Amino acid sequence: MVKEKKKADKKGEKSARSPSSLSDNLDFSKQDGNTTRQEMSPAGVPLLGMQLNEVKPKKDRQNVQQNEDATQYEESILTKLIVESYEGEKVRGLYEGEGFAAFQGGCTYRGMFSEGLMHGQGTYIWADGLKYEGDFVKNVPMNHGVYTWPDGSMYEGEVVNGMRNGFGMFKCSTQPVSYIGHWCNGKRHGKGSIYYNQEGTCWYEGDWVQNIKKGWGIRCYKSGNIYEGQWEDNMRHGEGRMRWLTTNEEYTGRWERGIQNGFGTHTWFLKRIRSSQYPLRNEYIGEFVNGYRHGRGKFYYASGAMYDGEWVSNKKHGMGRLTFKNGRVYEGAFSNDHIAGFPDLEVEFISCLDLSSGVAPRLSRSAELIRKLDGSESHSVLGSSIELDLNLLLDMYPETVQPEEKKQVEYAVLRNITELRRIYSFYSSLGCGHSLDNTFLMTKLHFWRFLKDCKFHHHKLTLADMDRILSANNDIPVEEIHSPFTTILLRTFLNYLLHLAYHIYHEEFQKRSPSLFLCFTKLMTENIRPNAFQIKGNLFREQQRTLYSMSYMNKCWEIYLAYCRPSAAPPHEPTMKMRHFLWMLKDFKMINKELTAATFMEVIAEDNRFIYDGIDSNFEPELVFLEFFEALLSFAFICVTDQMTKSYTNVPADDVSGNKHETIYTILNQDAQNKSPSAVMSHESDAAHSDSARSSSSKLELSPDVNKIRKSEPKIKKSVSHERVSKMNFKLTGKGITFFSSESKKYERPKDDREEEFNTWVNNMYVFFVNTLFHAYKREEAIKEKIRADRLRSTAQAQQRKMEDDELEARLNIFILREEEAKRHDYEVDITVLKEPADVSSSHLILDPPKEDVTVSPSSKTITSKKKKK
């Protein structure tokens, strides 16, 4: 028996230990919602300073911490136990099969044994009441199990070496706290969701690192306010979006330790009735420092006015540019939220921006300046809110008739203003989801649809021609003349109609007066009234299909730009002709027996009778993006057969139900992020409200700025509920969160014919755009990239060969020069050698006379010597 005790003690329980408290560090962080936001707008924007009510009192925090400390189980206490008694089977003296063991100190185990070890299903109860039910592997709690604490708290999920590790859920009994997600070594780590109340209205879902909120996550506070973005050390830190539903405000941008810091966008939503006079929101886009507007930034007012300049502690201070609601501009210095030099200008300034101040305007020496700037001294019958820009049109008439022309056309606009407002509101809402403040802003895409519905293009003008006409009077970058994301205010919409009316009908009324009035009246009579509200094309006909089609819009815009070419007409902006469109489809290998060139022409000419009459075709007209995109939607039904859709009938349910649909404003914001900072900042008040008109979206949307916005947005990560498959589910009840295990329910497709038709349409769209068009574009771009790489490689190789040839040639030249130098040197040596004998002989010839004496004397000596001998 002693031997059994030692074996059970040494082998069995040295590594098993109870986990630490699952409620440790529940993180009722002060940064979750009590940051006071000092966001008072000097122009009557509601006060932002408020405390969110999600933070627990300090006393509660202490109680929670005490409860946490009271349930810490970090020590390995099983190694101190000795088996006192055992009931069950034995094999060769070792515990085997099902049995019950009691240990010294009061701990017990009931379950399966194998070779003397706790192995298999079992229940271990500590002396203090903590209970573990689940799997054991050689005396160690492993795989799946349930911990139950004496106070009623419980954990169910994966266990590794006695620690919570993997996926599991925890529910605290002393506090209304529940967590479901991933664990590592007994701590929340990975993706998980924590609920702070029984109702499930206060929660956090996202990334955890060692019990700390860190990474990407969504925090919903008890008040309903929501933060979505990056976290660091339990605080909002990085890129994120906060929506204050209680005050109808939203901030998207940079955070540092729970406070707005860096570049961001703050929007104030105002509830309005339908057909409100002002379709915009009060919005600030710029730099923040410690929650204040500080640095460079733009403030867009709901009236259409805009301030672009420097800010200091929420006040305009420094150089700035103020655009009034009528389009007039003041540019100069500001001091302490006033125009420099006019310290008593504040009340008039607020009044002229149509922001309620609660104080009646008072006269001052600056009133005359304001009347000139905001147009209140103007005698226009349209009032100061709308000022028609007729300078270019009036220049076409003699100066003597210009006042009468202007007056009569203003009367004409005034008579039709109600109908024009209704038209503007109707078309600007196409393709848009729910608006938080019941307002919509027209984009160029909506405007094109209006022009085609009213048959403006039947007057020998394409939509591209109209864009060029309308851009002549605006400082619009060349690459944005045909952008579908350009926004259009009501006053801009009216100005556009007047300019187009003149270009279409001026020849007919050039000899009659008032000519401009007659042009506009005929435009209203023959084009607008009979045809407005009758939506043609296949993009905006049905709301649900429109929202789904928008999900493909950004990629199609990218493809459209890739195949545009400079226009032949000034200012030579990039456009796409019909022949370019057809060539593109041919390159994509999409021209086949289903989609022939003739079918292509029929689809394009369906809304334009001047392109194709059944015999002759005109491939020269330019296509704007609306025509390009609607043609692709039509091609989807032609190219995709029933056999192709059969293999794609299981489109995700979220796509079918519309949960992932994008509105035109969501796409507009995404497009603005892709623009260069210079392009974005160059917009004036009529074209720079891309972000201000967006509807609520589940995606993190950031506004761009020079050297401020990060190039990479945090990616929207999958929620924990999407990751667990047939593991653990939970539901909200009146008493809190109930956890249960079940199989995932399969999505059942409704049997209704209308739903079936819509599902078929969705499948067609998916097959055509994702599997056909986008795949072909990707393949073509890969080929082009390979060609470019090959060309670069060939160029580099040619340059390398040229360098090698040049080097070889240089070496040969050097060798030849050296050879020539050597030959020349040898030649000089030979010449020197040849010259030396000649020099010697010549020297001998010169010295001959003296040598004659020398030659004679020896002979005389010999003669004399002979005489002496004799």
From Swiss-Prot:
Residues in coiled coil: 784-811
MORN repeat feature ranges: 86-108, 109-131, 132-154, 155-177, 179-201, 204-226, 227-249, 251-273, 284-306, 307-329
Matching InterPro entries: MORN
Protein name (Swiss-Prot/TrEMBL): Radial spoke head 10 homolog B
Ranges of compositional bias, category Basic and acidic residues: 1-16, 683-692
This protein's record includes keyword Lyase: no
Stretches with biased composition (Polar residues): 17-39
Keywords: Cell projection, Cilium, Coiled coil, Cytoplasm, Cytoskeleton, Flagellum, Repeat
Organism: Homo sapiens
Cytoplasm recorded as keyword: yes
